[in-house]
A protein has these predicted regions:
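Extended catalytic cores of very large enzyme megasubunits
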Residues: 1-148
């Protein structure tokens, strides 16, 4: 395995976008990033020889997994693997669609949505504005903001 990427540009993109920072050690090398991906995503889903071949192919830039999975493999993806996806889709046909979209966006994943008549006709009408003294307390987390 090689710690070097072929060009300065590739090295910059790796260090600035995908390499985790480790206190006292600095940023990961390309090897470290691929190993983190392998340990956390590939795991033991394939036999050791296939796992080694996959690692070598990624290391040599012959194949590339989702860059979001390279970036988030580890603790972030263990908490919620939504962060590993580049994009998602949902039909806006229920009020919970808005909660789901907010949560997915807060995880860093894009959300495409449908507002076709057959979907949005299932939503309740929005009431007229009215004065209220109600205070809403929002838990400062992805889940809290999505439910607010």
């Amino acid at each position: 395995m090689s710690n070097q990427l072929p060009t300065d540009y590739q090295a910059f993109i790796h260090k600035s976008r995908y390499a985790k920072y480790h206190e006292g050690q600095g940023r990961e090398s390309w090897d470290d990033t691929v190993t983190r991906f392998s340990v956390n995503v590939i795991r033991d889903m394939v036999d050791p020889e296939t796992k080694y071949q996959l690692e070598q192919a990624i290391m040599g830039l012959e194949v590339m997994p989702s860059m979001r999975s390279l970036m988030t493999a580890g603790a972030a993806a263990e908490r919620d693997n939504t962060c590993m996806y580049n994009c998602s889709y949902l039909a806006v046909d229920d009020l919970k669609s808005f909660d789901e979209a907010m949560f997915i966006l807060l995880c860093g994943t894009g959300v495409g949505f449908s507002v076709e008549r057959q979907s949005i006709s299932k939503l309740p009408e929005v009431p007229e504005l009215f004065q209220s003294e109600t205070n809403i307390v929002v838990k400062d987390s992805k889940e809290g903001w999505a439910k607010a």
